[in-house]
Amino acid sequence: MSEKSIVQEARDIQLAMELINLGARLQMLESETQLSRGRLIRLYKELRGSPPPKGMLPFSTDWFMTWEQNIHASMFCNAWQFLLKTGLCSGVDAVIKAYRLYLEQCPQPPEGPLLALTRAWTLVRFVESGLLELSSCNCCGGNFITHAHQPVGSFACSLCQPPSRAVKRRKLSRDAADIIPQLLDEQIEQAV
C-alpha cells in the first residue's frame, strides 16, 4: 500500500480551492487533482455553500464557433498559448493564469463570464487533441479558434465579418464620436 504525500495532498486541496473559486465543475476537479470525489464534494460545499452542479460537461466544438463565443474563446486561447510558448507556466497552471487574464480583459456581465472556466478547460482539451486550432484571419491577422485543418487564407473572423444578427443586437453608444460611424454603417446597410 502506497502512502499519500501530505504535501501533494495539500497542493491538491489548494488547487481545488482555486478552481472552485473560479467556477470549475466537479469533473474538472477530479481530472486535475488526486483528491477523492467525496472530498471534492465536501470541499465544494464548504466553499460555495451548496453541492456542485450536476450534469455532463460540454462535449461539442460547435459552441466555440458561434460569433461571440468564438471571440471570447479566442482571447482565452491566445493568452493560454502565449503562456505555454514563453514557458511561464504549463498544465492546469497555464489554464488558470490564462483564464484570470481573460477575466481581467473582458468586462463581465452580472450573470457571469461568457466563457466559464470549465468550458475554457474543455477548449484546451479540444485544442490539445487536434479538434480545434487557432487560425489567422485573412483580414485583420488575428488568431481565432476554428475547426482543425481550416484551409490557410480562407478564414475571416467574426469581428471582420460579423453575422447579420450581431449588427442588429448592437446598441448605439452615448458618445458622439461613436454614434456617427454607427449611424453611417446602419444607413449603408439600409441602402444596400
From Swiss-Prot:
Q: Specify which residues bind Zn(2+) according to the UniProt entry for this protein.
A: C137, C140, C157, C160
Ordered alphabetically, the record's keywords are: Activator, Bacterial flagellum biogenesis, Cytoplasm, DNA-binding, Metal-binding, Nucleotide-binding, Phosphoprotein, Transcription, Transcription regulation, Zinc
Protein species of origin: Salmonella typhimurium (strain LT2 / SGSC1412 / ATCC 700720)
Q: Where in the cell is it found?
A: Cytoplasm
Q: Which NCBIfam families match?
A: PRK12722.1
- Listed name of the protein: Flagellar transcriptional regulator FlhC
Q: Which GO terms describe its biological process?
A: bacterial-type flagellum organization; positive regulation of DNA-templated transcription; regulation of bacterial-type flagellum assembly
Gene Ontology terms, MF aspect? DNA binding; zinc ion binding
GO cellular component: a single term: cytoplasm
Q: What does the PTM comment of the record read?
A: UMPylated on Ser-31 by YdiU during infection.
As for what it does, the entry says:
Functions in complex with FlhD as a master transcriptional regulator that regulates transcription of several flagellar and non-flagellar operons by binding to their promoter region. Activates expression of class 2 flagellar genes, including fliA, which is a flagellum-specific sigma factor that turns on the class 3 genes. Also regulates genes whose products function in a variety of physiological pathways.
Tell me where on the tree of life, at the top rank, the source sits. Bacteria
Q: How is its activity regulated?
A: UMPylation of FlhC by YdiU inhibits its DNA-binding activity, which inhibits the expression of class II and class III flagellar genes, and interrupts flagellar synthesis. Switching off flagellar synthesis facilitates Salmonella escape from the host immune system.
Q: What happens when the gene is disrupted?
A: Double knockout with flhC decreases invasion of host cells.
Record note on quaternary structure: Heterohexamer composed of two FlhC and four FlhD subunits. Each FlhC binds a FlhD dimer, forming a heterotrimer, and a hexamer assembles by dimerization of two heterotrimers. YdiV binds to FlhD which inhibits the ability of FlhC(2)FlhD(4) to bind DNA.
Q: What is its main location?
A: cytoplasm
Family annotation (HAMAP family): FhlC (MF_01891)
What disulfide bonds does the UniProt entry report for this chain?
none
The modified positions for O-UMP-serine read S31
Family annotation (InterPro entries): FlhC
